[in-house]
Amino acid sequence: NAIQERFDQGRGSVGLADFLRRAGIRFILLRNDLQRAPGLVDPILTHQALAQSPGITRVKSFGPGVGGEPYLEKGGHRVVINQGWQSSYPALEVYEVHDGGGQFVQASTAPVVVGGTESLLSLADQGVIQDQPTILAQDLSRSDPSPGSVILTDSQRARVREIGSLNKAYSYVLSPNEDTRFVDPRDYLSVDAQKWRTQAKYEGISSLTVSSSKSDAGADLGRGPSAAMDENPSTYWVSAALDSDPWLRIGLDQPMALGEITLTTPPDSPDPQVVSVQTEGHLTDQVKLRAGVPQTISLAGTRTSWVKVLGETNNGFPMSLAEVSMPGVSVQRVLRLPAVPAAWGAPAAILLEAALDQTAACASVDLAVRCLDISSSGEEDHGFAREFTIPQGAGYDLEVTGQPRGGDALESLIQRDRLISIQADSAVVSDPRGSALAAIDGDPGATWIADPDADVLAAFAHDLPDEMRSDRVIA
């Protein structure tokens, strides 16, 4: 899964060569002749990820060229292929991992990793480990004496798996007992391995459950139930498309008298959505929610230990909620790491990693940057929180790696103190490589594309340092 995620995002990995060497892998066979289909990684992203991974080079190719030009022209008309994500590759390519091959070391020198095998690639990326073998904590007993060097990670997360699928074949991270509504298997983990999982917990409420979610296994991970209570109107929960009886239920920490609840639907949701709200001993009348408009519903001050929002009728569309708020209730979702046994002492290193599972929107294709209108979102696009305990106090050097979030704030930062600036009414992607900045960067391979679904006509403003006369605009 760790390698699959890198390829799906077109994201290179400085530790990938070490990761493969540890597994005894020397060669990678890349099949460019396979038919593209949903659920498979686009070859454009695979090539980009491999090109950005040091220690891995192409050494051989076979067969005829497949693919082709990103567009076709005839009679003055142009047809774009796969939204521009198209190039020509040999049918088969062989990549070599330098100095690949297996190795043996003494077990006493191998570090113990608390987490799953997927953490090994991230640990190699950060330089915590190289290509030496490791031991997983799940292969040891908690009663064993200190195994030596211990590394704590949040990688083995409690998810439901869509067995048989390769790409995005897992759900958002689950809280304890939340997986009871799923048909898909939680994961094929041994009883010992399940004790080392990282699980979600909610602070401020006792539980948050839904009838279904678009962020179930194989779907959009950013549309889970917590998105409806994160105080961020740009994120939202969406029920599964075939859920005929959708609902969202909030378990309170303790019974309380609730006078009202405020519901907000996404701006692009069906208008209206019809819902009702149920508490212990009270059910409201049906209420029509207008898209993007907060609606406060009276709960008559009833004392209750839970609140349930029921979708009544939506003409076949999924139910969606951007924000659910109640006076006196503040919610934060936290991922809680497994506890390290006291006998093992403090970990030598701790790795906490945000879920970077949003599908890449822009990619480099033959020296040009091409961006797609991709609607999927990541589980932790807007921040993350972790909770863990260690057996004893210890000192650590803190290292933080981040990446910029696309949007108006980033574009303003990039243009700070520049003689010229540019603003656009919309963009089809949030990636700055596809923003209005691409129109003035001097690179004909980078392009600004307006959002075709925007409510306004596509336009951008170019601010100059002073008044000047111009007799032409070149685009």
What do the predicted segments below correspond to?
Residues N1-A475:
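Extracytoplasmic
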